[in-house]
UniProtKB/Swiss-Prot annotation:
Its cofactor is Zn(2+). GO terms for molecular function: metal ion binding; tRNA-guanosine(34) queuine transglycosylase activity. Catalyzes the base-exchange of a guanine (G) residue with the queuine precursor 7-aminomethyl-7-deazaguanine (PreQ1) at position 34 (anticodon wobble position) in tRNAs with GU(N) anticodons (tRNA-Asp, -Asn, -His and -Tyr). Catalysis occurs through a double-displacement mechanism. The nucleophile active site attacks the C1' of nucleotide 34 to detach the guanine base from the RNA, forming a covalent enzyme-RNA intermediate. The proton acceptor active site deprotonates the incoming PreQ1, allowing a nucleophilic attack on the C1' of the ribose to form the product. Its EC number is 2.4.2.29. One of its GO terms (cellular component) is cytosol. This is Queuine tRNA-ribosyltransferase.
Length: 378
């Protein structure tokens, strides 16, 4: 159940109740692609840094260790020891971006595993079956994430097929949830709006998928090559056509600035690999922008990454020490940076929710964006 608690302009402060707990939105989903956050971060760490919901990848877990094995072990929650909500993406993005020699038909997609090259077929039914075996809280519909700069004819054909796939996903999910041995009979299904940067195609698709009465709706196919301005323009035009009584999810986005701007356009859910990926390379986020701990000026810096930060890294270690660990290629350095970045993102969302509740989001966003430019000017 989705309940809007407060609005401030187009920004929404809401809560989304699931069988695995209630999520306070806007929220950032911490990305654990293979049922773990890259950077030696455990689910016990996620509890400590305030993570509300985790995201795992259908394609990767299907390939290794196998969704049937995870079902045999009681589902993804038990497998990774996580009792809060989990969203699984459909595998579509990976099929269309990572896998080699793919062949698209109405039935689905045949492609090669990125691990050993063996052929895999995945269509709407297969994606739903895999996600049902995982038992995630929220399953994403199987879709084609077309390149942002694909021509209009290709995008239109892709969107029409994605809609037909969504109808099949809904039917299959209903069947799977009714089975006596299903891991999570309350599994939810989110549909995905596609259409590249063609707003008229996206709006038409948004209207069509809205009629299917799903548990939530995502805007997909962005942050794949278009400019930020194009992405925001899509959100400005499309989000108003998605159901306002259901959560809205912007897939794969993004930077702190992207999140601030997109919340202002009505988005509830976000996910992105940036916090963990950048952290593993010594790039850490602060309210004054992103800094590179490999920079020589931090060699003798005794301050934490960010003053006042409550993360395990900032509470215990200096920039100089973390820089030393990174230079020495000690895994602890990478782990501390990832923990800090995830804490930063989670805390940013806490501040965003408070600003909306208090009716001051416009000013909060403006100040936050201004502060983030500080390091860029040094």
């Amino acid at each position: 159940m989705y309940k809007i608690l407060k609005t401030d302009g187009r920004a929404k402060r809401a809560e989304f109740t699931t069988v695995h707990g209630t999520v306070q939105t806007p929220v950032f989903m911490n990305v654990g692609t293979v049922a773990a956050i890259k950077g030696a971060v455990a689910t016990t760490d996620l509890q400590q840094i305030g993570t509300q919901i985790e995201l795992s990848n259908t394609y990767h877990l299907h390939v290794r260790p196998g969704d049937k094995i995870i079902k045999q072990l009681g589902g993804l929650h038990k497998f990774m020891n996580w009792d809060k909500p989990i969203l699984t993406d459909s595998g579509g993005f990976q099929v269309f971006s990572l896998a080699g020699l793919r062949k698209i038909k109405e039935e689905g997609v045949t492609f090669q595993s990125h691990i050993d090259g063996h052929k895999i077929f995945m269509g709407p039914e297969e994606s739903m079956q895999i996600q049902s075996n995982l038992g995630s809280t929220i399953a994403m519909a199987f879709d084609e994430c077309a390149p942002a700069k694909a021509d209009r004819k290709y995008i239109q054909n892709s969107v029409d097929r994605t809609y037909r796939w969504l109808e099949r996903c809904k039917k299959e999910m209903a069947r799977l949830n009714s089975l006596p041995d299903t891991v999570n009979p309350d599994q939810m299904l989110f549909g995905i709006d596609q259409g590249g940067v063609f707003n008229d195609i996206r709006i038409d698709h948004a209207k069509r998928i809205s009629e299917l009465d799903l548990d939530g709706y995502a805007v997909g196919g962005l942050a794949v090559g278009e400019t930020h301005e194009e992405m925001y323009d899509v959100l400005d035009n499309v989000v108003p056509y998605l159901p306002q009584d259901k959560p809205t999810y912007l897939m794969g986005v993004g930077t702190p600035a992207n999140i601030l701007e997109s919340v202002d356009r009505g988005i509830d859910f976000f996910d992105c690999v940036y916090p963990s990926r950048n952290g593993r390379h010594g790039h850490v986020y602060t309210k004054f922008g992103k800094i590179n701990l490999f920079n020589a000026k931090y060699e003798t810096d005794t301050a934490p990454i960010e003053e006042g930060c409550g993360c395990p890294c900032c509470q215990n270690y200096s920039r100089a020490y973390v820089r030393h660990l990174l230079k020495a290629k000690e895994m602890l350095g990478m782990r501390l940076c990832v923990l800090h970045n995830l804490y930063y993102y989670n805390h940013l969302m806490t501040d965003i929710r408070a600003a909306i509740e208090e009716g001051r989001y416009a000013g909060f966003k403006e100040e936050a964006l201004y502060q983030m430019k500080t390091y860029d000017k040094q």
